[in-house]
Amino acid sequence: MKIKIQKIHPNALIPKYQTEGSSGFDLHAIEEVMIKPHSVGLVKIGICLSLEVGYELQVRTRSGLALNHQVVVLNSPGTVDNDYRGEIKVILANLSDKDFKVQVGDRIAQGVVQKTYKAEFIECEQLDETSRGSGGFGSTGVSKA
């Protein structure tokens, strides 16, 4: 699949996959952003893109940022719809007790292209019964036993 990319800032970098087996590509910051502890920051990527109809871009947390700095994509996965043509931006949340400084060029998130499907919604009076029913939020337990 080919994705058209428009750089709208001189610091913008064209995304690339780091390894042959990578499903995600890195998204790079175009400016410095200081994110205070237990706060969020909006990080600009400096690119716009054009996806094929039937696909979306999911913006996901980089595992190293989560593990080493407790910094995550707040709405992970963030969705970039195929008809959006604006600048890609990432909402980062700093869950740590320390300031987190994003530097120009830092790989702050990863993008994954995913197929999308349109559902047809059918209103009904009652849903089919299942053994689970309406149980949720831990209703199936957490232990193996």
From Swiss-Prot:
Report the function annotation for this chain.
This enzyme is involved in nucleotide metabolism: it produces dUMP, the immediate precursor of thymidine nucleotides and it decreases the intracellular concentration of dUTP so that uracil cannot be incorporated into DNA.
Q: Which Gene3D superfamilies match?
A: 2.70.40.10
The record's InterPro entries line, in alphabetical order, gives:
dUTPase, dUTPase-like, dUTPase-like_sf, dUTPase_trimeric
Under Gene Ontology molecular function, one entry of this record is: magnesium ion binding
Q: Which Pfam families match?
A: dUTPase (PF00692)
Instruction: Name the cofactor(s).
Output: Mg(2+)
- Binding residue positions for substrate: R62, S63, G64, N75, T79, V80, D81, K89
Record pathway: Pyrimidine metabolism; dUMP biosynthesis; dUMP from dCTP (dUTP route): step 2/2
List the EC numbers from the record: 3.6.1.23
Chain segments annotated as coiled-coil in the UniProt record: none
- Supply the source organism for this entry: Helicobacter pylori (strain Shi470)
Catalytic reactions of this protein: dUTP + H2O = dUMP + diphosphate + H(+)
The yes or no answer to whether the keyword Cytoplasm is present is no
Protein's recorded name: Deoxyuridine 5'-triphosphate nucleotidohydrolase
Q: Where is the signal peptide?
A: none
Q: Name one GO biological process term.
A: dUMP biosynthetic process
Disulfide-linked positions: none
